[in-house]
């Protein structure tokens, strides 16, 4: 079968290879991927900055964001059947009894990222217990489930932490960044009924700005405009230390700051003492979140369904670039205005 591969640690080793078709072991299923999403983690792996091949392999098959059809089931599988359309979660525990998305570094494997082959191939295998079934009406946008699940977990944590203290009812939100994660965060917050401001460095007539406005949100071009006021929930989705600093100054008293970016080493925060004093004196919370489990994948699918109905098929508009296995390189070539790129494994 054909698969999109890299040799982790070797920059620009991206290749389309012929590899052996996998077989499902006990408790596993064989998948026929339909679509695979491409994200910044793939870019880091291709550049040789991250990633690990499975034990005994030199190469790693990419693809951790996927929607797929079950085509074969292994012994002992009772939660999935042939023909089911599913989304597989990413992580698998490694000597860890915690929920897998809370396992510390070194105690998990990740499809298409760390120690497990991904789904950017004609076939893939995964453990059946980590599958989420996809309703027929959202199969076309289900490839967005994995990045959305990360958002769902972060916002869910914000709500749970906030409401554990008192009857906290957030009304306003600020989203820093309008990439896929920032836009999906805007979508969730608007579905929750929060007045939401989203900011990025694109002009007001850009597609990203239009997508924010279609959700009923307010867009601010941070290259020329200033954000004013404080917000009950602030979501940082840029991965920029400078933007973290800005967000700290916009958390309302009793508010929650959700960090979803992965940040480079180095950098400094201006007025850190003053900002942290404000966090303490105003009972603010800062929480980081990564990955997600079954629950948040299910929440993501429900919000995709609602967004399709309530916002005129809005999720589909995030997919701005499509490629297939014959021109796979295009999927892994990033341009300034791409939002979400999808690799179509099964051509319609």
Swiss-Prot record:
The positions annotated for binding NADP(+) are 178-181, 260-262, 289-291
State where substrate binds: 41, 110, 146, 291
Keyword presence, Nucleotide-binding: yes
Give the EC number(s) under which this enzyme is classified.
1.1.1.47
Q: Which CDD domains does this one have?
A: glucose_DH (cd08230)
> What reactions does this protein catalyze?
D-glucose + NAD(+) = D-glucono-1,5-lactone + NADH + H(+); D-glucose + NADP(+) = D-glucono-1,5-lactone + NADPH + H(+)
Q: Name one GO biological process term.
A: non-phosphorylated glucose catabolic process
What keywords tag this UniProt record?
A: Carbohydrate metabolism, Metal-binding, NAD, NADP, Nucleotide-binding, Oxidoreductase, Zinc
What cofactor does its activity depend on? Answer: Zn(2+)
Instruction: Report the enzyme's class at the first EC level.
Output: oxidoreductase
Q: Does the keyword Protein biosynthesis apply?
A: no
Which Gene Ontology molecular function entries are recorded, alphabetically? D-glucose binding; glucose 1-dehydrogenase (NAD+) activity; glucose 1-dehydrogenase (NADP+) activity; NAD+ binding; NADP+ binding; zinc ion binding
InterPro entries listed in its UniProt record? ADH-like_N, Glc_1-DH_arc, Glu_dehyd_C, GroES-like_sf, NAD(P)-bd_dom_sf
Question: Which positions bind Zn(2+)?
Answer: 39, 64-65, 146
Function text: Catalyzes the NAD(P)(+)-dependent oxidation of D-glucose to D-gluconate via gluconolactone. Can utilize both NAD(+) and NADP(+) as electron acceptor. Is involved in the degradation of glucose through a non-phosphorylative variant of the Entner-Doudoroff pathway.
Q: Which family does it belong to?
A: Belongs to the zinc-containing alcohol dehydrogenase family. Glucose 1-dehydrogenase subfamily.
The protein's name is Glucose 1-dehydrogenase 2
Q: What is the protein's species of origin? A: Vulcanisaeta moutnovskia (strain 768-28)
């Amino acid at each position: 079968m054909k698969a999109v591969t890299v040799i982790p640690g070797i920059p620009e080793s991206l290749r389309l290879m012929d590899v052996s078709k996998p077989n499902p072991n006990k408790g596993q299923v064989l998948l026929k991927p339909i679509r695979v999403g491409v994200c910044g983690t793939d870019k880091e792996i291709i550049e040789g900055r991250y990633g690990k091949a499975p034990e005994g392999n030199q190469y790693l098959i990419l693809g951790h964001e996927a929607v797929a059809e079950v085509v074969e089931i292994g012994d002992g599988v009772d939660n999935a059947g042939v023909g089911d359309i599913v989304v597989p979660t990413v992580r698998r525990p490694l000597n860890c009894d915690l929920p897998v998305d809370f396992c510390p570094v070194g105690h998990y494997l990740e499809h298409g990222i760390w120690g497990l082959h991904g789904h950017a191939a004609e076939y893939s295998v995964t453990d059946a217990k980590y599958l989420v079934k996809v309703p027929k009406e959202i199969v076309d946008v289900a490839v967005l489930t994995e990045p959305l699940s990360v958002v769902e977990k972060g916002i869910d944590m914000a709500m749970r932490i906030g409401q554990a203290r008192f009857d906290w009812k957030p009304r306003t939100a600020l989203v820093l960044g309008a990439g896929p994660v920032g836009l999906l965060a805007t979508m969730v917050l608007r579905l929750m009924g929060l007045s939401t401001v989203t900011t990025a460095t694109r002009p007001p007539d850009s597609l990203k700005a239009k997508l924010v406005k279609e959700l009923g949100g307010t867009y601010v071009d941070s290259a020329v405009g200033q954000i004013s006021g404080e917000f009950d929930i602030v979501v940082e989705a840029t991965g920029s230390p400078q933007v973290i600093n800005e967000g700290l100054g916009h958390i309302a008293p009793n508010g929650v700051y959700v960090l979803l970016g992965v940040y480079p080493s180095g950098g400094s925060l201006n007025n850190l003492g003053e900002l942290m004093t404000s966090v303490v004196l105003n009972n603010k919370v800062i929480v980081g979140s990564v990955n997600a489990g079954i629950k948040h994948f299910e929440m993501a699918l429900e919000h995709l369904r609602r967004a399709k109905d309530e916002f005129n098929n809005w999720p589909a508009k995030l997919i701005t670039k499509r490629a297939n296995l014959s021109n796979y390189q295009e999927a892994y070539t990033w341009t300034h205005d791409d939002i979400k790129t999808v690799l179509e494994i099964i051509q319609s």
